[in-house]
């Protein structure tokens, strides 16, 4: 290491503070800052009874299906029964963790009275906010600027907030837009604090159609709002000018204002960059108030090094923030997720700083909303149900982490089990690393053993003791560097944070000062591309490499619990509604990540996770294996079309009275369980139906492709990336100094697939079912087989169920728009359906014996 790097200083863990209460009586137990409430027993018991009835009827239904084969369509019958069994097993795995839902309540007034007493400095813990910006070409810089402004204007002590924006593409446009946002923040933040406006993303705030004059707003507020809106319009003009200029990339690359080339002209080969935008000494807003800190970060990238995408960027920010600000908690956001509730950070602190459960809470996952109200079923049903067990899963954004949990430590209850162990025993436990207990043993050893060399004493015995301490010190340092990396400043901050967190209140934020030059140099070092080599980053500490769900899974496996927070006003909201291409691309990425976790040797919930309960494990298995259900679902959606076009059936033609009653009761139990689930979750029926249609579209497209991509990636190491462009586009900017050979080598392990390719399967399914419905009805009317309308009605009902789920997708596919619909997807679908039908007729003409006409004549 460089000689100017900071030395590791001795770290002493302070004794825990005595518990205090709001009344001031030391003997009183402090009031909790949050509580978990169960769903009313009447609603929950009815829901459980409906699920149990559905399970019993499913067992009877499968007994009927297995014992009543269809002789003239044996292959179709076997296929349909196999699909039904597969889908039923998937439903059961996902249903069992959903039997104990819970609701959370936070007490912001108690948080304020405990940590923000009048006349005293705020003792709320420091929070480092990470904003991930991946590609400025797809993510408008105005969206990133709004996200940053909403974070900086949050209702939280300014000295306790530090915002880090990671630019994974090293784009000069992102840097310039953040520079403009930092200047606008000096006026926007005091405006929000003076008037308490919501939301605090200026684009979302000024887009609200509210008549403030009708509400008799104060004249000063109306005047300030008009002036601020005028300034924001000017800010948008400057941002749009930057975006327009960025489309014309100079041949020699971008040049900064001082005449030097932009270091990130080559997005795949550039040095690390860190710039302090807010937080210099004397930085004040227009009202003279303190400003939060804002940093621009772009990690180093070199050919030949794996960068691990978003997880690698988050780990880089975790190390940089530890060196510069070292907040006790970390909140990560995507660049298009704005803070919609200014009290979001306080809501998170109600869980993290809770005197009862705070030491066992690894992260708080917030609900993520958009203007269309999507994902209501996932957040308001599935996440609440997991919250009743060990906690919700991590979904990749809108999550507040404990830094201690990210570093691989175990919760306080597990960490305090063996505090009487000596130093030698500690070393024996931590020599191999990879376990939370070894990390906690190291923490105790670090607090017990000074980290600076002791001076030799005259006494021989003291010299021997000093020599032994130095040997142990070298061993500890080597072990720490193998685990965390070769950065004394980062290692010291890791154990400093633990001592501060164990003090009881999570520590108080330091004053806003500009980082020393030596700290910035160390921060540059910890984001170098070679820093993680031969360390445990991405395997045991930080964000796990292999999928976002794996990060929360590893924490739960160590014994931590998590919390789900969904305040009345959503904490975070998407800047703009996602396009269909972005929806499919996002669904594809999540499904591929889920398959990667399921097939992982380290993070698979099927066998990993020593401290997971059965229901929590089933919740993770359901979350990781959901793409597999796309295989039977796609086949089952195609079966009605096959039956209508061939005159075959997957059910026996003679249905007894008992069989009919069983089928009716099964359908009733399905409807009852869904209705009761919507009742206790308060999810509107319209939102549920929208989620069902989206589930069908993504299951037959993105999830179906993800199954093969996951298997391909696990077997060959080839990753498949999806592009939201319908045609090949030129590179974003020139890669100076990188010839074609190096570029091909960088892309050798990645296959790019356009999003329109995902539309072939759902388009084929809906076209085949529509063709089957039209052909079957026309054939029945033309030939007068009215006695067969009963059997035909069942087939039409199944085909109608498929078409009803995909009709929104079909309307969107054929709707008029600025550009033509993806013709290639429609053509491939029609060709696929036609070829499949002809092959069936060709095979049936040689295999089926000649028979007299019946009411079940093949239509083709």
Curated annotation (Swiss-Prot):
This is Putative cellulose synthase A catalytic subunit 11 [UDP-forming]. The chain crosses the membrane at residues 44-64, 73-93, 627-647, 658-678, 702-722, 758-778, 790-810, 824-844. Its EC number is 2.4.1.12. The gene is CESA11. Residues 65-72, 648-657, 723-757, 811-823 are extracellular. GO terms for molecular function: cellulose synthase (UDP-forming) activity; cellulose synthase activity; metal ion binding. UDP-alpha-D-glucose binds at residues 138-139, 168. SUPFAM superfamilies: Nucleotide-diphospho-sugar transferases (SSF53448). Residues 223-249 form a coiled coil. Pathway: Glycan metabolism; plant cellulose biosynthesis. It comes from the Eukaryota. It comes from Oryza sativa subsp. japonica (Rice). Binds 2 Zn(2+) ions per subunit. Catalytic subunit of cellulose synthase terminal complexes ('rosettes'), required for beta-1,4-glucan microfibril crystallization, a major mechanism of the cell wall formation. Belongs to the glycosyltransferase 2 family. Plant cellulose synthase subfamily. The keyword Cell membrane applies. One of its GO terms (cellular component) is plasma membrane.
